[in-house]
């Protein structure tokens, strides 16, 4: 390490005790709502109700952080409080690096996280940079300041389970059960999603603290003492037709093979451990969590090897379930790739969830539309729920989702909601929310964003763009164009990341957030952004030859020069 890097290494802090929470109400800390919004959402990402490990700036997904270190966090906060409405803050891998004069319709923040030149886009190189304080893993919504807790993925998981039920069980999951693992920020959505879809679930998690958190937030119903107890509960509840979620503390690489040996037959098998990051996110079998964390620092290469070997056993068990005729699918954590790298040559014999169940939605620009109430008042969300029903009156499935979400989903941090809606609907809802702020029906502005897992904002050959019809799985021009268009359209902040969901070298993706502050200027920006953003998804899928997307483009009047109009 050079002398300069040695100084850099000593000059930053990853761990700091204390509680970060976003302000509530209408009193501003920043100069306007356009800068108050990213400030509150950054802080909300680190709220103890939201983040997995807030003292180390980790929001979710292994080491997905909101800022590179605490010094950078403090400077981001300072910069946002001082930022004028004709200036733009640039954030490079969680570090505020510049403030530039732009104009009032430009984004207030532009973020680039974890991006590496392709030849160097590996965990090994990233971890070297990370150790020197030169990079930060932003996951998808951690480093882009629009994570809303496990609710953010609940509906996508719910839609997946419902569609799997339609395809395999005549649309009825009553008396069925899902086997899965991982109860972190993303995987924690699975038990509740299964329950809402009408199924029981057995959810394996190696950290008791995560099980405790999911039970506290009502994402998990109960915990079993051991595998025998878990299977007995599953047998009882499925026989009774109840949809109950059960957590089991243990290692999936040990428990799934044991279930195969016993001849246990779930009705659906998937996984959402943090397998994308073998150094930080997947516990090798036979190890304790404390041992894993210590050895990841002292002997990272051996830790990665051990984690991948355990993943191989995990995937082999999933393959055995599939070969027994049980619907089995990857839920986007790249576990198949990790297993393949250590010799499981047929790891990709079971599909990813997007080509299996979700792509028809993406073809219509339908994806994870989310919003948060900057007031902190849950009533603002309930009023927007009602507005969604009013503006989309004939979608019974969506109405059921909103009713179930209100009944079952606990808000984490600032109250927020997610619902999957598409091109045309997003702009209508955004303009309506803005009018509700203008009229005073909502007590403060709201922000509208989305996951990077959306129809036009990601290139990820092992997840969102797996098995594209034209073979364009790895073409990453599309998320770059999405980020550029959202910037040109006037989103309040725009992000461009690498490695989210599936790890370094396997994805590029972009995000946007826009503020509804009740002004005419906001309405103009909302109309542009919330049309153009999902339209890029329709464009991307139409370009790949999907008839559903081509029809949608024609219906919505999109100008796609190479697509016959």
Swiss-Prot record:
Name of the top EC class for this enzyme: lyase
Intracellular or extracellular location(s): Cytoplasm
The EC number(s) this enzyme carries: 4.2.1.49
Transmembrane among keywords: no
Entries under SUPFAM superfamilies matching the protein: Urocanase
Entry cofactors: NAD(+)
Gene Ontology cellular-component terms listed: cytoplasm
This protein's UniProt keywords: Cytoplasm, Histidine metabolism, Lyase, NAD
A Pfam cross-reference name: Urocanase
Biological processes per GO annotation: L-histidine catabolic process to glutamate and formamide; L-histidine catabolic process to glutamate and formate
Binding residues for NAD(+): 61-62, 139, 185-187, 205, 210, 251-252, 272-276, 282-283, 331, 501
Pathway(s) where this gene product acts: Amino-acid degradation; L-histidine degradation into L-glutamate; N-formimidoyl-L-glutamate from L-histidine: step 2/3
Reaction(s) catalysed by this chain's protein: 4-imidazolone-5-propanoate = trans-urocanate + H2O
Record-level Gene Ontology MF annotations: urocanate hydratase activity
Active site: 419
Record's signal peptide: none
Sequence segments annotated as region (Disordered): 453-472
Gene3D superfamilies: Urocanase like domains, Urocanase superfamily
Note on cofactor: Binds 1 NAD(+) per subunit.
Biased composition (Basic and acidic residues): 463-472
Disulphide-bonded residues: none
Functional description taken from the UniProt entry: Catalyzes the conversion of urocanate to 4-imidazolone-5-propionate.
Homology family: Belongs to the urocanase family.
Cross-referenced NCBIfam families: hutU, PRK05414.1
Protein name: Urocanate hydratase
Organism (species): Pseudomonas syringae pv. syringae (strain B728a)
